[in-house]
Amino acid sequence: MRHGNVPERVELLVIGAGLAGLACARRAHDEGIDVLVLDAADAVGGRIRTDVIDGFRLDRGFQVLLTAYDELHAQVDLDSLDLRAFKPGSTIWNGRSLETLGDPFRNPSAALASARARVGSLDDKLRVARLRRRLLASPAEDAFEGPERSTLDELRAEGFSEAFIDQFFRPFLGGVFLERDLETSASLFRYYFRCFAAGDAAVPAEGMQRLPEAMAEPLEGRILLETSARTISDGQVTLDDGSTIAAGQIVLAADAHAAAELGGTSPPDFKPTITSYYSARSAPVTEALLVLDGEGSGPANHVGVMSHVSSAYAPAGQHLIAVSGVGEAAQDAASFPKAAQAQLTRWFGPEVERWDHIKTYEIPYALPRHPAGFTEHRPPRRAANGAWLAGDYTDFGAIQGALRSGRTIAESLMQHLAEVPQ
């Protein structure tokens, strides 16, 4: 899949080998369309990449896939990913102690401890149960049919206390939305909340990059890496080396900013995140649970011991710890690693000082912003130069959104081809 001989013409040229581009190319390829995928990077995946450093598997930013995503089941052989799941629930630093909120519906033995956990009130926890039951009673897409308001307004309307919102929802959803102000559309809150209730948060045993690699396997020989597109004009793509490819249809599935430059569109606003990885001889917690900053002091928002989720993430005898920040903390890579360790010393004790920093990933364009009403302001399906647009920013910022955008664009362009006289 490296840079090779560039054909003069293809039926479909997909620019970008992230999830959206791969989903589009696979759907078209399955229908017998002659497709070629270009990407400037040295591997498929887009924002979903995994680096191996001294035996540690470092995803480029903390990432998980939710097994409740229906596009995953439709497009990927999940058994081939050897998925390893986080334990349902989370551990929360409330400013004084670490408290664990389990999922009593999926782990009944956690019910008593969760009820006693000093996070929110019993009424808050009963409201979570009622909300869970209500959302699971309807199809996932119904989440987008409810009131259009911010997540914060939704939580208040549901009757949750401010203390529970601050201690649980802000850090938990902060890790999902990459913002703790909870300005993200309530429709996405309802959708994600249902997904977490209906399935697992998981990673492939050998790192998140296994997902795009598995998607790329049926496209062997149809992907050119380290190949950049410079311009698009009149159904022709000019590459950085000056060569050209004519294409019957062109799909821009590159990252939103590159797509905007090639397509002449305006890029959407994005949210940043940052993840520092550390190695340690002993883990700060004993289970594969996310640990959340319910105090709100930062800079770390959530912590995951990846070696508890999959032993392949770290060499034998070592643990890999992922520490992530959002908002302002995500924009200060120079100070984040040490500041996060200082913060986590309060949570876990002096052992944190002996963690060895491996690498920090600063990701300025991690997720598109989706405020209330975002579905009414999605980008057009085609750019002014005729290229089709695919990517999570055209649907919603998630693996589900990326996969669905790629598939639906492939189906739209195939319908277009069927309707246009040849």
Can you say where each PLM-predicted feature lies in the sequence?
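Mid-domain catalytic core of redox enzymes
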Residues: P7, R230-S335, W347
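Conserved flavin/dinucleotide-binding core of flavoenzymes
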Residues: R2-N5, A312-Q422
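Helical element adjacent to the flavin cofactor pocket in flavoenzyme catalytic cores
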Residues: R190-L239, I245
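Short beta-strand to alpha-helix junction loop
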Residues: Q63-D70, F144-P147, E158, R194-A216, ...
